[in-house]
């Protein structure tokens, strides 16, 4: 029946991958997986043991993985002054030995699927791709410091997120929202909606990148009622090469958590400091929400059943800020602080009214609280730095850098029960990004020609687990 399902889907879906390949096994590991496309998203269902999850992942997304690998190496070489072989070597020497066997099997399953689809990539390509956040922005500056060099990269400061409960929401239950800020090279390809049904642990619904086993920006709900998202900590400095990769800990935390305490404990087990985040976590069964700030030396956990937490890339704990970042909390005009001020304003204005629709509006908010007018720019919750003559120096984003909000997601308690998400690709606050027009206006980014691609603004779109095309 599963084979028939895949065949039917392929007949009606543009660019549907699975398809027969030479030498495929009779017990095809791709069985059970399927994909369809909707409003810029590629919905992918994966199920089974780790190696099957990995094989299905690549078998269904081979073209997208090939394309992401094509652009990410040149992009990182320009922005971090390290070539792709550097990242492959770090994946092999620094990360692989600390990855749990379950996820090693899944990653190797992706590699096996790549071979079946004639994509030339190996284990170290895929591990490096999964570490696309923690290696460039955390390992690289740490290594520079160890070698007595000036840091060639900085930790990123991307995303705007909130979580609210109790008297702040319309139905007194949890509402959570997030929009992902990143460069448009990678961000325009951050368009996968994964329905992940592993052999062990909880089922997951999450957005993500092709070839990557964790949401990574992050927005996930699991079948135990745990929902989580995050924003990175601007100016963070620190990395422990003896720790476990963040991408593995984040995936494991969502797959095996049944409580907020579970989530924090898994993230702290073997913490390497990579991709240091302020995590916004909710327990749909209790209505409790938490802000878990996860640095390397410092961490804190704030929780409530009546209130909210917001994230826009500012450190919350003063001790962490002073010991592990160079963040300036007094610069009211920088991106993180301006967006924080706007968050506080919106949460006060919408107390008792926050629901999914309000969440969509807030994640699409383009107001610049400093200039007191609509943006979007680097200081609006939904941002377009390609429209800003200031850029974001804290993130090494120059004037008119091609980066900003690339997609957004919202969920509430009733949706979490059924494992549903509303999501929108592109700028929910602005027009399409047209690569050729941008490059014609900004010759300083000519190096990104062939890496940047158009990114169309798409409508908010509903997804749920087990969904089929047309449902």
Q: Which positions does each model-derived feature cover?
A:
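Active-site rim segments in enzyme catalytic domains, especially the processed small/beta chain
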Residues: 164-166, 170-260, 265, 310-312
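C-terminus-biased signal that marks the final domain/tail of proteins
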Residues: 21-159, 169-171, 185, 201-202, ...
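Positively charged n-region of N-terminal signal peptides that target proteins for export
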Residues: 1-5
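C-terminal motif of bacterial Sec signal peptides marking the signal peptidase cleavage site
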Residues: 14-15
């Amino acid at each position: 029946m599963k084979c028939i399902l895949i065949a039917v889907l392929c007949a009606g879906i543009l660019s549907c991958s699975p398809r027969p390949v030479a030498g495929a096994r009779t017990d095809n590991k791709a069985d059970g997986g399927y994909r369809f496309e909707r409003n810029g998203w590629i919905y992918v269902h994966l199920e089974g043991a780790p190696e099957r999850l990995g094989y299905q992942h690549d078998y269904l997304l081979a073209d997208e993985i090939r394309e992401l690998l094509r652009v990410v190496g040149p992009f990182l070489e320009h922005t971090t002054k390290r070539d792709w072989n550097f990242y492959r070597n770090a994946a092999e020497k620094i990360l692989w030995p600390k990855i749990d066997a379950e996820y090693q099997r899944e990653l190797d399953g992706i590699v096996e699927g790549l071979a079946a689809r004639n994509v030339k990539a190996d284990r170290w390509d895929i591990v490096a791709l999964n570490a696309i956040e923690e290696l460039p922005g955390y390992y690289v500056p740490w290594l520079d410091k160890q070698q007595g060099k000036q840091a060639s990269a900085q930790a990123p400061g991307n995303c705007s997120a909130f979580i609210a409960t109790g008297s702040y929401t319309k139905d007194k239950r949890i509402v959570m929202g997030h929009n992902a800020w990143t460069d448009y090279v990678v961000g325009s390809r951050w368009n996968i909606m994964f329905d992940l049904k592993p052999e062990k642990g909880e089922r997951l619904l999450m957005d993500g990148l092709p070839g990557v086993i964790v949401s990574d920006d992050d927005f996930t709900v699991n079948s135990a009622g745990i929902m989580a998202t995050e924003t990175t900590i601007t100016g963070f400095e620190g990395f422990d090469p003896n720790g476990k990769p963040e991408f593995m800990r984040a995936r494991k935390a969502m797959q095996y958590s049944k409580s907020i305490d579970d989530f924090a404990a898994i993230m702290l087990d073997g913490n390497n400091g990579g991709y240091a985040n302020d995590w916004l976590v909710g327990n749909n069964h209790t209505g409790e929400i938490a802000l878990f700030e996860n640095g390397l030396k410092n961490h804190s956990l704030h929780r409530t059943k009546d209130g909210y937490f917001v994230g826009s890339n500012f450190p919350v704990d003063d001790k962490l800020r002073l010991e592990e970042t160079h963040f300036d909390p007094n610069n009211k005009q920088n991106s993180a602080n301006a967006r924080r001020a706007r968050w506080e304003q919106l949460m006060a204005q919408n107390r008792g009214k926050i629901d999914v629709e309000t969440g969509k509006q807030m994640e699409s908010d383009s107001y610049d609280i400093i200039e007191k007018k609509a943006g979007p720019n680097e200081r609006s919750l939904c941002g377009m730095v390609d429209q800003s003559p200031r850029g974001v120096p804290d993130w090494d984003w120059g004037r008119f850098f091609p980066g900003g909000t690339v997609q957004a997601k919202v969920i509430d308690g009733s949706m979490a029960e059924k494992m549903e998400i509303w999501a929108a690709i592109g700028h929910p606050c602005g027009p399409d990004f047209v690569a050729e027009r941008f490059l014609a206006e900004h010759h300083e980014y000519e190096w990104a020609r062939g890496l940047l691609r158009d990114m169309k603004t798409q409508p908010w779109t509903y997804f749920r687990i087990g969904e089929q095309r047309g449902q």
